């Protein structure tokens, strides 16, 4: 189920960003910084294919930076499963710009050695991608009925920590 994949992926991406905060190398930091710079450039030019590739590379660099082979393997599997739809959502100018901004915020949290903030931002980044996929009508690409708005909202109010659940 796509919803489950995004829910699990959001948590694992958060964990990955958390771990990367203390384990990332200088070279990986430079890769992320360059990635964001290039993403902004290609977004201004309307190059959606390049931005989709840069988005993939951003996540791959983050997976490497956490230095956990098992976590990287799990995230790559989830990432690959939703790749087709991700390319379509990233071709949307608004989502592409939002995604780049979210990457930049994750990068800044890692750079500033703020593991909890990096975790929260990475988690929210995946949730935002999921919400955009549903709003764009791409959920059906997996042969599934789209959830109702209340089914996919990430409830962080009052300490809630799940998709549509408290």
Segments predicted by a language model, with ranges:
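Conserved amphipathic alpha-helical segments that form helical-bundle/coiled-coil interaction surfaces
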Residues: 8-11, 15-18, 22-88, 101-109, ...
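Short linear motifs at protein or domain termini
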Residues: 1-22, 64, 130, 134-166
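Anionic, Ser/Thr-rich low-complexity intrinsically disordered regions
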Residues: 96-100, 118, 128-129, 133, ...
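Bacterial carbohydrate/catabolite-sensing allosteric modules
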Residues: 26, 46, 94, 113-116, ...
């Amino acid at each position: 189920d796509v919803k489950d994949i995004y829910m699990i992926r959001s948590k694992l991406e958060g964990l990955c960003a958390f771990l990367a905060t203390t384990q990332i190398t200088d070279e990986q930091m430079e890769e992320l910084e360059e990635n964001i710079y290039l993403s902004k450039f290609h977004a201004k030019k309307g190059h959606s294919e390049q931005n989709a590739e840069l988005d993939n590379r951003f996540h791959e660099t983050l997976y490497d930076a956490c230095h956990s082979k098992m976590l990287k393997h799990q995230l790559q599997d989830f990432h690959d499963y939703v790749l087709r739809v991700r390319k379509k959502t990233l071709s949307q100018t608004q989502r592409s710009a939002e995604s780049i901004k979210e990457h930049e915020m994750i990068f800044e949290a890692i750079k500033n050695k703020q593991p909890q903030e990096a975790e929260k931002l990475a988690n929210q980044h995946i949730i935002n991608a999921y919400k955009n996929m549903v709003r764009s009508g791409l959920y059906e690409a997996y042969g599934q009925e789209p959830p109702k708005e209340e089914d996919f909202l990430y409830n962080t109010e009052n300490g809630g920590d799940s998709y549509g659940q408290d």
